[in-house]
């Protein structure tokens, strides 16, 4: 289970790093909204708010979800990860997408928060980062589904899957539809 354990750790750590960055940005947003301090100028406020929202509501949650999916399949069902190399490609696509997106925001031309469609267009790198992240997350979800098939075919469990794994299956199905819809909507903007 070593490839799965490494991927679980790396995805969880990436999620915690995104949470930390988003938390620091939340402090900047809070101190700006506090009239006594008013830390950031208006143009930086929306820039920081955009990065905070993406790091906290997209990157942290999805990195952590992928870690949970791999745990629920490989560890709880005691089987090997279906395609570890493809899982690593998915992870690095997600990392690359998150970095590109944050760089695009902090360059100052992508402070659109979650309204990144006309007329509030952002730099193409902003959309590229989100699309790469989404593709990586989708690939990771399919690795999870493949791992479930491996577990069933190798007979690593009897009867139905554990409740946590069932919950992970439900979360992965919702994630696939949500992430795919989001990525498809963003493709024309890129």
How does the language model describe each region?
Residues 1-190:
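Membrane-embedded and interfacial regions of multi-pass energy-transducing membrane proteins
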């Amino acid at each position: 289970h070593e490839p799965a354990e490494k991927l679980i750790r790396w995805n969880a750590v990436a999620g915690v790093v995104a949470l930390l960055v988003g938390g620091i940005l939340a402090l900047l947003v809070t101190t700006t909204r506090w009239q006594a301090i008013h830390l950031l100028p208006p143009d930086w406020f929306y820039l920081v708010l955009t990065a905070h929202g993406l790091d906290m509501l997209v990157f942290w949650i999805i990195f952590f979800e992928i870690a949970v999916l791999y745990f629920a399949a490989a560890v709880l069902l005691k089987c090997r990860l279906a395609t570890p190399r493809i899982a690593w490609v998915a992870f690095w696509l997600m990392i690359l997408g998150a970095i590109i997106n944050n760089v695009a925001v902090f360059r100052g031309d992508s402070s659109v928060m979650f309204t990144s469609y006309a007329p509030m267009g952002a730099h193409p790198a902003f959309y590229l980062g989100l699309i790469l992240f989404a593709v990586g997350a989708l690939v990771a979800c399919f690795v999870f589904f493949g791992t479930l098939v491996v577990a069933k075919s190798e007979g690593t469990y009897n009867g139905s899957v554990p409740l946590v794994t069932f919950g992970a299956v439900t979360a992965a199905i919702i994630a696939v539809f949500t992430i795919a819809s989001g990525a498809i909507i963003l493709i024309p903007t890129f």
